[in-house]
């Protein structure tokens, strides 16, 4: 995705319009990213038809789209430039098992 900011902005400004990404998706992870940004669907052709295993690639995209959409609907946590501890560990020993 060349401009995730633009897709995020479109979703925010057009919350009740169906938004579909129809170009630039070459890997299942790209579809996940589009769906996590709030897109309603993706259109695919070359990424599936030109793969070495189109049936397997179609399955991978199906799972990627489902996961991305479910993540968006579940409410992704905001991204951060720094790691932020969310587990209270103050005064507790920390042991890796």
Predicted regions and their residues:
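Short secondary-structure boundary segments
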Residues: 23, 46-47
């Amino acid at each position: 995705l060349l401009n995730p900011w633009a897709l995020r902005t479109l979703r925010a400004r057009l919350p009740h319009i169906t938004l579909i990404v129809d170009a630039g998706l070459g890997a299942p992870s790209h579809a996940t990213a589009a769906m996590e940004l709030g897109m309603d669907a993706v259109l695919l052709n070359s990424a599936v038809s030109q793969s070495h295993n189109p049936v397997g690639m179609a399955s991978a995209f199906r799972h990627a789209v489902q996961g991305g959409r479910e993540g968006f609907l579940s409410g992704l946590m905001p991204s951060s430039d720094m790691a932020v501890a969310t587990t209270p560990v103050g005064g507790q020993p920390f042991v890796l098992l």
